[in-house]
Amino acid sequence: MNDRLFIFDTTLRDGEQSPGASMTKDEKLRIARQLEKLGVDVIEAGFAAASPGDADAIRAIAETVRNSTVCSLARANERDIHAAGGAIKPAKSGRIHTFIATSPIHMEKKLRMQPDQVVEAAVKAVKLAREYTDDVEFSAEDAVRSDMDFLVRIFDEVIKAGAKTINVPDTVGYSIPALWGERMKALIERVPGSDKVIWSTHCHNDLGMAVANSLAAVMNGARQVECTINGLGERAGNASLEEIVMAVRTRRDVFGCDTRIDATQIVPSSKLVSTITGYPVQPNKAIVGANAFAHESGIHQDGVLKHRETYEIMRAEDVGWNANRLTLGKLSGRNAFKTKLAELGIVLDSEEALNAAFARFKDLADKKREIFDEDLQALVSDEGYATEDERFKLLSMKVCSETGEVPRAQLVFTDDGAEKQASGEGSGPVDATFKALESVVHSGADLLLYSVNNITSGTDAQGEVTVRLAQDGRVVNGQGADTDIVVASAKAYLHALNKLHSKRERAHPQV
């Protein structure tokens, strides 16, 4: 059996379906570049038929990425296949991932199609996709609740039609490892021509077993795993890329395969996705959580000090953890700044953008004695928080908060280029800031989440604020970073408002 495990990352498609995690084209490009640096085999860049914006983002990634295959999702219909084919056309290596539901409940209630019609649609889609690329993947949506005989039949037919990868998804996160492994093994044994394709698995985490189910599939013959950075995804999320990769690498004696992932890029990838999407990583998250390599117990600490392998099965530095390394200071020049951005995988598209970023860096260096890698990531992201059709932008603000007095906030911001002033009172400086903004913009949005995370250590560290707003069924995340938490909060709120006013709205299907 092949000892190479292919990593199919769907952070930019399935991961983006997390509430409020929608990304701009530039944000998707930043993540795609990092995924390429990480060494993923396939980047599912989006769902081209969802919107012109999604198709444009996929096309931009296809033009940029050269060491990973760029993929677009497509339902099994002509419109979706044509949209996907056009979007991946510039790619050095492009893939179309087409799918159709195969479970009785989906065929009857959603598709309103007979099994014969479903097979016919799947075969037709694969053949049409082959007109754009030889690399076609087929997924049987809700395979976990599909009849085995029907799965064998439809997989047989799409392989004959030219599919190169067969993906078996647990769309609703219903299976358990023993049963999922058995299903994968049985399909590989029963489907004619199974040795001519790569078998893949795509597991959701509704019962907390996405990684375990994926690994069970690998142990039973799957050689592609579909996953996301930090396990990001709709509902309870997807299988975590970092956990899949390190489980297979650490226990190669069990799995008998490995990936081409550069594990030292795992933590940087995790931090970038967290920053852009506004989804913080829980401290006890395996591999990428802040406590993943922390030892509190005295017995554990003593053992680790004597010999690290007594309590550590992998090294923190192997997955990209390092101390907050001092990188630049207030005396650092423009060339040093540009070089450091390049080392971090940050690409600015013009000299004007570089000059603007350097100006923000010098401003930060005046407020903060030591500048770390994480500060630079946040600095560039803070500017990247501007949406493609930015309406609101903070110019200045003043907050008054005294013991025994009601906090007050005054802000100056632009609204479609026109300068506006706002003032308000609240139970605290952040509450006063948000009420001041609402007194002018009147969005009527509900505040679902407000969170603050320190970017680095120290009392002068930048704070990164995430705000989640809901309006008329839309949910968006806004982010802002600053050494002043209240300023960061105002930036985050305005960023969320900009997203609500943006016309970028997509609906991605489940797989």
From Swiss-Prot:
Which residue ranges are recorded for the region named Regulatory domain?
393-511
For biological process, the GO terms are:
L-leucine biosynthetic process
Sites where the protein binds Mn(2+): D14, H202, H204, N238
**Is this entry keyworded Cell membrane?**
no
Matching CDD domains: DRE_TIM_IPMS (cd07940)
This protein's assembly is summarised as: Homodimer.
Alphabetical list of PANTHER family matching this protein: 2-ISOPROPYLMALATE SYNTHASE 1, CHLOROPLASTIC-RELATED (PTHR10277:SF9), HOMOCITRATE SYNTHASE-RELATED (PTHR10277)
Query: What range(s) does the Pyruvate carboxyltransferase domain occupy?
Result: 5-267
Spell out the reaction equation it catalyses.
3-methyl-2-oxobutanoate + acetyl-CoA + H2O = (2S)-2-isopropylmalate + CoA + H(+)
Main EC class of this protein? transferase
State one Pfam family annotation.
Answer: LeuA_dimer
Q: What does the record give as its pathway?
A: Amino-acid biosynthesis; L-leucine biosynthesis; L-leucine from 3-methyl-2-oxobutanoate: step 1/4
Q: What name does UniProt use for this protein?
A: 2-isopropylmalate synthase
Enzyme Commission code(s) on record: 2.3.3.13
- A GO cellular component annotation in the UniProt record: cytosol
Q: What does this protein do?
A: Catalyzes the condensation of the acetyl group of acetyl-CoA with 3-methyl-2-oxobutanoate (2-ketoisovalerate) to form 3-carboxy-3-hydroxy-4-methylpentanoate (2-isopropylmalate).
Q: List residues traversing the bilayer.
A: none
Cofactor list:
Mn(2+)
